Amino acid sequence: MFVRESVMVGGRALTLETGRLAKQAHGAVLVTYGDTMVLVTAVSQDERPGLDFFPLTCEFVEKTYAAGKIPGGFFKREARQREEEILSSRLMDRPLRPLFPEGFKRDTQIIATVLSSDKQNKADVLALTGASAALHISDIPWHGPVVGVRVGRLDGEFVAYPTVADIERCDIDLVVACSRDAIVMVEGGAAEATEAEIIDALMFAHETAQPVIDLIEKMRAAVGKPKREFVAPALPDEIKRRVAQIVDEDLKAATKVTDKKARYDGYSSLKKKLTETLSAELGAEKLLPLQGLVKAEFEERKAHVVRTYVTEEGRRIDGRDGRSIRPIMCEVGLLPRVHGSALFQRGETQAIVTTTLGTSTDEQKIDGLMGETWKRFYLHYNFPPFSTGETKPLRGPGRREIGHGALAERALSRMIPAPDQFPYTIRIVSETLESNGSSSMAAVCGGCLSLMDAGVPIKSPVAGIAMGLIMEGNKYAVLSDILGDEDHLGDMDFKVCGTARGVTAIQMDIKIAGLSRQILAQALDQAREGRLHILGKMLETLPTTRPELSQYAPRITTVRVKPDQIRLIIGPGGKTIKGIVDQTGVAIDVEDDGTVNVASADSDAVKRALDIIKGLTAEPEVGATYKGTVKRITDFGAFVEILPNTDGLLHISEMAHTRVERVEDVVKEGDSLDVKVLSVDREGKIRLSRRELLPLPEGEEGDRARERMAQARDAGPPPRRDGPGGRGGDRGGDRGSRPGLDRDRGGPPRERRERRS
């Protein structure tokens, strides 16, 4: 049955349709907003025995044909997911996963395919809404729906589903997943927004989502399939009670062990004790098929003990109260050859973070449906297995690492100086060396310190903190700076990053139905308190940005030339710029507006390159003195090159204070001499003088000499020695090339991103 429903949101129609495309999927919905269209399918297969996790995969796929483009590369087809697609996949996964039934372990796959892109409306939030609708109308057990809403603040007003152009101007940009009653996921950034402004944005998103939720419910009523019956497997009640009797008291003792490794060793011993006891009581054969359920029940008992300890006694696993921050240790400049480095440790979480400075040739090219863009600041987050005492194959970064890196990058990006203030490409790498919660926030704090250590003039220091929540019945506790166990066993992971003035990035995931405004406000208030504490500790280590760059960092010097002089620097086929690079060893980048960046760690090399560039683009200045080289001799004077490819005429009358009979008597080709620029006419012809730089003859003879020179100029040049008659013709001749032009340097400058060095 074909159904199409629409609702107006953000000033445009949001349309959901089903029953026309992908009818063999268990649920399929086409989402249209503007001319952007996303097809989302949901399929769930039979359960695989032996799984102890939920095998859900969410895939966001951009097809280049959606934007009228053909993929690059040899094969001319879409390959592996780009980073933006991975982040959009996570954006679907995070709010959808908690809404599946507890114990549901069937292979479930959600695929969002961008079929059309108008390059104005982003498809990520549409994919989330489409995934929710596809699951809701399918027979797959799921406790939705939710709706994805992008909220921006533009000129002080909140805007729903802002366009790509508007997002660039927004000082708040959030993606919010909303259910009927609550907010279930948040991801976004801001320009130092206050906590109250963030809450207002979240409430605006929740209000905006309600008509779309109505739309999904209407579609479910029209075409929804009956949900499959699902009953989560469970242990018999008597075995559950026996598990509690065996482990509860020991779990309480193990939970109070503050050292992570010792605590985990205690948990492992308890698991072994539980298995041995039940095996002896039930028999190995009877226990074997129940081992997975026994393991799950042990985790349930552990969660109950930890959560009760927090809500009843007000204490946490490591002995802290709800607001306390773990001990912090910071160190900077520990890697001598790195441009900027920092070691940040908070409790048992440790990261070493580096900053590397490069030139514009190191910018990252982003080629997506929205067009080609370039990033001059990027952050990479690594999480090696040894950081948690494990062994795993070393492969490329996983989705979690890419997501954590994007969050830390967003937190710092608004504090990076503009290119005209700091024309460097900046790469931060965070290596997690130890992890017991909040390693992404260690990347933010360490990244800020490494930027300051590198001499990057950031606008304000940034810190990050992860907040948690535990709700047991009518009691709840908001936790600052959560441990890994508090993240795993708790109900919320709420990361907040910002400066002393406000929030720059947030990320929130919850495992419960939703959060009230009161709990959100308390969490943000505690986060601000913790953030200021962490910033204080960071600034004790490095109060301000270092005034100088590392001696190993490239020095970028910027000069500006006229756009029509770019060809002089590039040369025919890039010959000139390649020659400068080969001669000096610098990196040179030329912008279309005439901005020239010269970079090298060797300041002398930069100076040599700049001298060459200035020489190539310099224009003769009237009254200035130049050391020139005689290029050509004529009977009326000499043509002297005073700047590269720029000649002027040194007339015979301007060679000396006395009458000159033959030019060759004063200068010869190849001679080097000082000359002064007398004038530059409209055609660019240059008149030079040597005479004005020579001392005047003294006394009466000098006066007569000046008089004779004046008469000589009035009378014209002497007769030719090599034949009868005078020179005739043009007295001035071609007096030099026009500044900035050369017959060998034709052709327009290349486009900005065609690298020139």
Curated annotation (Swiss-Prot):
Residues 702-711, 719-757 have a biased composition (Basic and acidic residues). Residues 623-691 form the S1 motif domain. It is found in: Cytoplasm. Its cofactor is Mg(2+). SMART domains: KH, S1. Residues 697-757 are annotated as: Disordered. GO terms for molecular function: 3'-5'-RNA exonuclease activity; magnesium ion binding; polyribonucleotide nucleotidyltransferase activity; RNA binding. Its main location: cytoplasm. GO terms for biological process: mRNA catabolic process; RNA processing. The keyword Magnesium applies. Mg(2+) binds at residues 487, 493. Keywords: Cytoplasm, Magnesium, Metal-binding, Nucleotidyltransferase, RNA-binding, Transferase. Its EC number is 2.7.7.8. It catalyses: RNA(n+1) + phosphate = RNA(n) + a ribonucleoside 5'-diphosphate. Belongs to the polyribonucleotide nucleotidyltransferase family. Involved in mRNA degradation. Catalyzes the phosphorolysis of single-stranded polyribonucleotides processively in the 3'- to 5'-direction. This is Polyribonucleotide nucleotidyltransferase. It comes from Sorangium cellulosum (strain So ce56) (Polyangium cellulosum (strain So ce56)). The gene is pnp.
